[in-house]
């Protein structure tokens, strides 16, 4: 009898064990880091849950860093505790690629399914180091109550004129953050910029760059159509647009959900004007894999899921991104005419004549020095040509050698 009880008990344990999910010891743990808003966080948590259900032998450890993401990421790499899968943008990517920290992902996806500009944001020496989730181009958000005929804005001078005309009664014609990401559009219009396309030469002192900088500064100090920092008090540029204090606002797709929730007036978007030779600067975010990962095959499989059409649709539905996948970008999910902005195609039209923001591993050091140097240009105390002299350009060039 005793033997029978033991046998039955053993059988029960065996049967129960057959129905159990893999234990933590049997699972491969993949560490995945990302920044992101609450909306993005919620999507990622669901995406991870779905992936784990389909792949019970994998556990994804999600490292969500809502602020100071890259500072945290630097520390993780320095302490040899880096994630297997890393969400990254093209501005910071060179730091990790040049240091040999990212895996070459060439051949892991069908590149024909993606916008070339998005792929180029993560390509170095013809190798792909991250799979793009989105591609970001800057457009002009228009307060249609204040700008009745936005179609008149066909070049940078008609933009200047419309902004000047709209500046009255406490309203500024144009606004955006005083950051290289935004004012660089002015330089690009005149075929200028900060760095050459290969990131090896400073072009900040060239004629087009100086011309674009000065036009931007003149709109602040002469036309008074762009506010000084002190004109904004404690408001952000986005808050000024939401409050009807700005007629035209230069920014990216990420503000669409916020504007849909808070803006009370009629609004839409149009492309930032271009010449026949100028190119819109674009940026991208995507998923990379640490070269040191001990679970590369699992990590690659997870990244393929993150970059799938199914997941791309989830992010696109929020309005936060312009998807890097062409099929999703051209679908009604993104181009829905019943949702604002009704002219979402403006984000895609900008890609027809575009290039990635030229960067190198020292790009942030370069822009930090430029930002400090330009204060007297933007406050009207000096001309751009006085401040951006040969000596300053040579100083910046040291970050390229």
Regions found by a protein language model. Give the residues of each.
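Conserved N-terminal structural module of periplasmic/extracytoplasmic solute-binding proteins
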Residues: 5, 18-95, 274-277, 297-298, ...
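Extracytoplasmic/periplasmic substrate-binding proteins
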Residues: 33-34, 93, 182, 214-295
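A structural signal for short loop-to-beta-strand junctions that line the ligand-binding cleft
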Residues: 75, 83-84, 111-145, 172-176, ...
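Hinge/lid segment of periplasmic solute-binding proteins
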Residues: 89-139, 156-162, 168, 268-270, ...
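Periplasmic solute-binding protein
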Residues: 93-101, 117-154, 177-198, 281-289, ...
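Short, solvent-exposed loop/beta-turn-alpha elements that line the ligand-binding surface or hinge
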Residues: 104-114, 172, 192-213, 260-262, ...
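Long, aromatic- and glycine/proline-rich binding clefts that accommodate carbohydrate-like moieties
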Residues: 122, 267, 317-376, 401
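Glycine-centered hinge/linker elements that transmit conformational signals in sensory
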Residues: 161-166, 201-230
């Amino acid at each position: 009898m005793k033997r029978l009880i033991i046998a039955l008990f053993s059988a029960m344990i065996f049967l129960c064990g057959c129905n159990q999910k893999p234990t933590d010891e049997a699972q491969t743990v993949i560490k995945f880091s990302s920044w992101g808003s609450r909306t993005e966080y919620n999507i990622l948590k669901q995406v991870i849950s779905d992936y784990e259900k389909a792949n019970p032998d994998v556990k994804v450890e999600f490292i969500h860093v809502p602020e100071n993401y890259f500072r945290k990421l630097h520390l993780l790499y320095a302490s040899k505790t880096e994630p297997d899968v890393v969400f990254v943008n093209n501005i910071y990517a060179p730091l990790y690629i040049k240091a040999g920290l990212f895996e070459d992902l060439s051949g892991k996806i069908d590149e024909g399914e993606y916008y070339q500009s998005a792929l180029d944001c993560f390509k170095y020496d013809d190798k792909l180091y991250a799979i793009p989730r989105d591609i970001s181009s800057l457009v002009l958000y228009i307060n249609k109550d204040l700008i009745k005929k936005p179609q008149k804005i066909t070049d940078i001078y008609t933009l200047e004129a419309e902004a000047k005309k709209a500046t009255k009664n406490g309203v500024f014609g144009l606004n955006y953050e005083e950051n290289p990401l935004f004012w660089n559009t002015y330089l690009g219009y005149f075929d200028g910029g900060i760095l050459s396309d290969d990131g090896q030469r400073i072009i900040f002192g060239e004629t087009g760059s100086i011309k674009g900088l000065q036009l931007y500064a003149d709109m602040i100090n002469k036309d008074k159509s762009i506010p000084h920092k002190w004109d904004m008090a404690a408001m952000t540029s986005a808050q000024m647009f939401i409050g009807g204090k700005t007629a035209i606002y230069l920014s990216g797709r990420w503000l669409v959900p916020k504007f849909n929730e808070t803006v009370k007036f009629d609004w839409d978007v149009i492309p930032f004007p271009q010449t026949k030779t100028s190119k819109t600067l674009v940026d991208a975010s995507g998923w990379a894999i640490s070269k040191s990962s001990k679970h590369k095959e699992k990590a690659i499989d997870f990244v393929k899921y993150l970059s799938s059409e199914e997941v791309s649709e989830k992010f696109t539905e929020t309005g936060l991104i312009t998807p890097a996948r062409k099929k999703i970008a051209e679908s009604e999910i993104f181009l829905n005419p019943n949702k604002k902005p009704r002219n979402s195609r403006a984000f895609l039209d900008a890609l027809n004549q575009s290039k990635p923001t030229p960067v190198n591993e020292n790009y942030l050091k370069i822009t930090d020095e430029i930002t400090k140097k330009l204060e007297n240009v933007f406050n009207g105390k000096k001309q751009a040509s006085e401040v951006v002299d040969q000596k300053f350009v040579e100083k910046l060039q040291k970050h390229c050698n």
